[in-house]
Amino acid sequence: MRNDDMAVVVNGVRKTYGKGKIVALDDVSFKVRRGEVIGLLGPNGAGKTTMVDILSTLTRPDAGSAIIAGYDVVSEPAGVRRSIMVTGQQVAVDDALSGEQNLVLFGRLWGLSKSAARKRAAELLEQFSLVHAGKRRVGTYSGGMRRRIDIACGLVVQPQVAFLDEPTTGLDPRSRQAIWDLVASFKKLGIATLLTTQYLEEADALSDRIILIDHGIIIAEGTANELKHRAGDTFCEIVPRDLKDLDAIVAALGSLLPEHHRAMLTPDSDRITMPAPDGIRMLVEAARRIDEARIELADIALRRPSLDHVFLAMTTDPTESLTHLVSGSAR
């Protein structure tokens, strides 16, 4: 792939804190094409926000390089800043100003004339369905409206790269869908997007590729379907109507339920999962055995691994992350 197709090129980036004792990022490399959406996933403290901070020139890497829209984040930070938009969980607009005033202010800061800034503000208020609230102080906006005006300010001049750090956290479903639609529009405009999110179904729906990072290291990369395939084959999920019947179901399934799956059951378990390489045949046989044992079920179905399964299978437990943090691994 030609370099001019690439909006983001990260090569061997390393970042440490505490005089090198805490490794936030360790030899991270990836590329993002123009118009591509990359989902950056990982548990808390994995290094996602540190990566966004480096790519947006808020902090410098200790080693490695990162090129954004042709500009080096260390030697050409001004060029990088002219080429990007960044939105995070904290809205970065002025609550004392109206939505329109914020947009005009950003336009003027970008060097637009007064008339051009007002015209662009009107266009963005229309695009983000905020015309009715344009004259109101942003401090009176709802969470979804505040997030939309924040993103709109980042689009006063179209960026080449967008960094969206958990943009839908805390939003209601309607506002969240509006952000999803916005990300889809970025693709059409050729804007490369790096999305961090705590909602795995969001990454599944929006991302062309997903990068899974844990303890500062990329542990998996690929499309959502490729990562799901790595997490395992189709499995059968069985939910009893009465949780007291779990042991009876285990007995009825017999050899269908592998020993290590039996060992995973705890007093708090509310369902049984087992591999189903034969798909529907396994489901039918399991249902037959349970029916013969006269056990009532709330549900029995074939499932495919979701990104939740990928996440749980490939990343460490948050309590382990705390242990690594104390001992000098990722931030």
Swiss-Prot record:
Topology term for the membrane: Peripheral membrane protein
Keyword Nucleotide-binding included in the entry's annotation: yes
PROSITE patterns, per the entry: ABC_TRANSPORTER_1 (PS00211), ABC_TRANSPORTER_2 (PS50893)
GO BP of this protein: biological process involved in interaction with host; daunorubicin transport; doxorubicin transport; lipid transport; response to antibiotic; transmembrane transport
EC number: 7.6.2.-
Activity regulation statement: Inhibited by reserpine.
Enzyme class: translocase
Keywords: Antibiotic resistance, ATP-binding, Cell membrane, Membrane, Nucleotide-binding, Translocase, Transport
InterPro entries for this protein: AAA+_ATPase, ABC_transporter-like_ATP-bd, ABC_transporter-like_CS, ABC_transporter_ATP-binding, DrrA, P-loop_NTPase
Domain of life: Bacteria
Ranges where the ABC transporter domain occurs: 8-240
Cellular localization per UniProt: Cell membrane
GO MF entries: ATP binding; ATP hydrolysis activity
Binding site for ATP: G42, P43, N44, G45, A46, G47, K48, T49
One GO CC annotation: peptidoglycan-based cell wall
Keyword flag Translocase: yes
NCBIfam families the record matches: drrA
Family: Belongs to the ABC transporter superfamily. Drug exporter-1 (DrugE1) (TC 3.A.1.105) family.
Record PANTHER family: ABC TRANSPORTER ATP-BINDING PROTEIN (PTHR42711), DOXORUBICIN RESISTANCE ATP-BINDING PROTEIN DRRA (PTHR42711:SF19)
Role according to the record: Part of the ABC transporter complex DrrABC involved in doxorubicin resistance. Responsible for energy coupling to the transport system. Binds ATP.
Assembly notes: The complex is composed of two ATP-binding proteins (DrrA) and two transmembrane proteins (DrrB and DrrC).
Name assigned to this protein: Doxorubicin resistance ATP-binding protein DrrA
Taxonomic lineage of the native organism: Bacteria, Bacillati, Actinomycetota, Actinomycetes, Mycobacteriales
